[in-house]
């Protein structure tokens, strides 16, 4: 197949606002209307808002792993804290060593820097092979080197504070928030309560909470064991480390509550460890967030197709999987540059492909313009749930209604059946029981038939069969041509020359003229002969009358 033309829109930061303003001038329209398409086996499964993003925002989380106990309770919690401290050091020291090796690999010499940089990466990978993601992570780690050094200068003050969350701004080039999940626990349980606890109970509570946090740390840094410092931390891992205090950093970086859940689901918020200090048990993580530009008038519509019944067999509609609509323009959307969530689509660039007039007309509601392929087999899932109702091909599967009892039949020539709560309350399909709560109102087109001219061949086997038929037709045509040539070869070429043809034409015209003249003369003679016969008959009759008159006298 030939390459398709496409519209490629890169989205550097300076173009985000310009693109958003341009698209905001276009008239807002409703999404693609799936009601006339459902009965043709084309189902609109949902819409997503289209956003463009670049990963440009960064901030730092300074995780305070070791909490400060109140003075009167330090002795009680000493044993579990010391055991916890030793376990932390054992667990995170390889991570800290790897971070230092990579950061120290930066030198002033360009060529030597590259060699030492790559060597540091490969030396920290267990298998000895550095992937592109690991190189990117190591590059980000080196870029955060100065910020990590600034944080280390403040480590004593960070470790000494009893605050669970506070901003660190002294000498830092980017926003940094110090958080302590364990400090939050200590503050809630011991500092901010008047309840007196005995020493044994304090040790038990602290020990249990520290063990739980160690389990979370082991889960978070499990991938770092095989490849220290080069594996990005997910947003879920960051929340495990920082607890609810993670929201403070995200809010400071400009992530609104309406975007937070969507961004968390997208996986675009990631973190890279940039420092670990075993003396104060300080862990620094650089968090990367995307700069998101929302395109208010642009949405992505997802389409699914069902295997429908046609007079040529089962077929599936030839439509794009995802289309985008801005105003009255509908084009196919390439989602390979996008990350999707339940409600949003985040793309580094917008790439669309124009559709043929036939597909455009089809998606606009003219189902007679839709084309179908016979590539779908009988084992294809012949039904789909849509808003509490079901669209099913009841010729491929048995549509058994349990309430009220009965079998739903599909009319001859009908592509699919639209089944809602008005026709069946409880539906059974291939052993799956569904309780229907939705309905297809009068705006849904029903009883759509697929014409033979709408079904084309696209599968490899079918194309081979059709090509065989074409070859047979061509062979038959060649045989007919050979017969014609053999007959033409028997014709005397001299008789078909130009002068001979002119002579034939002149003689033919002369013959026609003589023929016409002869015909006219013959007609004239016949007419004259008939006139003479009439005259003789009249004379004979008169003579007979005279003879009769004489005889009577």
UniProtKB/Swiss-Prot annotation:
Protein name in the entry: Fusion glycoprotein F0
Lineage of the organism: Viruses, Riboviria, Orthornavirae, Negarnaviricota, Haploviricotina
Site (Cleavage): residue numbering on this chain: 116-117
Coiled-coil region: 142-170, 466-491
Glycosylation sites per record: 85, 191, 366, 447, 471
Keywords: Cleavage on pair of basic residues, Coiled coil, Disulfide bond, Fusion of virus membrane with host cell membrane, Fusion of virus membrane with host membrane, Glycoprotein, Host cell membrane, Host membrane, Lipoprotein, Membrane, Palmitate, Signal, Transmembrane, Transmembrane helix, Viral envelope protein, Viral penetration into host cytoplasm, Virion, Virus entry into host cell
Compartment(s) where it occurs, according to its Swiss-Prot or TrEMBL record: Virion membrane; Host cell membrane
Disulfide bridge positions per record: 76-199, 338-347, 362-370
Quaternary organization: Homotrimer of disulfide-linked F1-F2.
Positions on the Extracellular side per record topology: 32-500
Covalent lipidation (S-palmitoyl cysteine), chain numbering: 523
GO cellular component: host cell plasma membrane; membrane; viral envelope; virion membrane
Transmembrane segments: 501-521
Gene: F
Gene3D superfamilies: 1.10.287.2480, 6.10.10.110, Head and neck region of the ectodomain of NDV fusion glycoprotein (2.60.40.1690), Newcastle disease virus like domain (2.40.490.10)
Domain of life: Viruses
Membrane topology summary: Single-pass type I membrane protein; Single-pass membrane protein
GO biological process: fusion of virus membrane with host plasma membrane; symbiont entry into host cell
Cytoplasmic side: 522-553
Signal peptide region: 1-31
Record note on modification: The inactive precursor F0 is glycosylated and proteolytically cleaved into F1 and F2 to be functionally active. The cleavage is mediated by cellular proteases during the transport and maturation of the polypeptide.
A Pfam family per the record: Fusion_gly
Region annotation Fusion peptide: where it falls in the sequence: 117-141
Assigned protein family: Belongs to the paramyxoviruses fusion glycoprotein family.
Function text: Class I viral fusion protein. Under the current model, the protein has at least 3 conformational states: pre-fusion native state, pre-hairpin intermediate state, and post-fusion hairpin state. During viral and plasma cell membrane fusion, the heptad repeat (HR) regions assume a trimer-of-hairpins structure, positioning the fusion peptide in close proximity to the C-terminal region of the ectodomain. The formation of this structure appears to drive apposition and subsequent fusion of viral and plasma cell membranes.
């Amino acid at each position: 197949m030939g390459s398709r033309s496409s519209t490629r829109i890169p989205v550097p930061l300076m173009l985000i606002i310009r693109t958003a303003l341009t698209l905001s001038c276009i008239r807002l329209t409703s999404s693609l209307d799936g009601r006339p398409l459902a009965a043709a086996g084309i189902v609109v499964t949902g819409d997503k808002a289209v956003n463009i993003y670049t990963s440009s925002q960064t901030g730092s989380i300074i995780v305070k792993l070791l909490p400060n106990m109140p003075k009167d309770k330090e002795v009680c919690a000493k044993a579990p804290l010391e055991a916890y401290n030793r376990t932390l050091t054992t667990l995170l020291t390889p991570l800290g060593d790897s971070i230092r090796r990579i950061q120290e690999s930066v030198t002033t010499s360009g060529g030597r820097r590259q060699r030492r940089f790559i060597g540091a990466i490969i030396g920290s990978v267990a298998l000895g092979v550095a992937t592109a993601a690991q190189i990117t992570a190591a590059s980000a780690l080196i870029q955060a080197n100065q910020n990590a050094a600034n944080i280390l200068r403040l480590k004593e003050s960070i470790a000494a504070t009893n605050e669970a969350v506070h901003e660190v701004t002294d000498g830092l080039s980017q926003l940094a928030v110090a958080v302590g999940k364990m400090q939050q626990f200590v503050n809630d349980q011991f500092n901010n309560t008047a309840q007196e606890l005995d020493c044994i109970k304090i040790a038990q509570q602290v020990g249990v909470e520290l063990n739980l946090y160690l389990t979370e740390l082991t889960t978070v840094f499990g991938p770092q064991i095989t490849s220290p410092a080069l594996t990005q931390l997910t947003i879920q891992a960051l929340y495990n480390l920082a607890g609810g205090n993670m929201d403070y950093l995200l809010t400071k970086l400009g992530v609104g509550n309406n975007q937070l859940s969507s961004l968390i689901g997208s996986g675009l918020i990631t973190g890279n460890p940039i420092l670990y200090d075993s003396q104060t048990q300080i862990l620094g993580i650089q968090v990367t967030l995307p700069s998101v530009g929302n395109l208010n008038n642009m949405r992505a519509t997802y389409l699914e197709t069902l295997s429908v019944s046609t007079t040529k067999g089962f077929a599936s509609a030839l439509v794009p999987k995802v289309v985008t609509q801005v105003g009255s323009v509908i084009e196919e959307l390439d989602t390979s540059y996008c990350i999707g969530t339940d409600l949003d689509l985040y793309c580094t660039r917008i790439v669309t492909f124009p559709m043929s007039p036939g597909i455009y007309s089809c998606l606009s509601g003219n189902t007679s313009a839709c084309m179908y392929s016979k590539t779908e087999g009988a084992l294809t899932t012949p039904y789909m749930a849509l808003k509490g109702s079901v669209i099913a091909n009841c010729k491929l599967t048995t549509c058994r209604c349990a309430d009220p009892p009965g079998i739903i039949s599909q009319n001859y020539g009908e592509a699919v059946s639209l089944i809602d709560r008005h026709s069946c309350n409880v539906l059974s399909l291939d052993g799956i029981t569904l309780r229907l709560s939705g309905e297809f109102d009068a705006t849904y087109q029903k009883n759509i038939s697929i014409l033979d001219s709408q079904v084309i061949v696209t599968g490899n086997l079918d194309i081979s069969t059709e090509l065989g038929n074409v070859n047979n037709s061509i062979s038959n045509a060649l045989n007919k041509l050979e017969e014609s040539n053999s007959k033409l070869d028997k014709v005397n070429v001299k008789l078909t020359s130009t002068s001979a043809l002119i002579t034939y034409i002149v003689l033919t015209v002369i013959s026609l003229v003589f023929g016409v003249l002869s015909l006219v003369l013959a007609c004239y003679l016949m007419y004259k002969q008939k006139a003479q016969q009439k005259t003789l008959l009249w004379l004979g009759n008169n003579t007979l009358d005279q003879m009769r008159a004489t005889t009577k006298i």
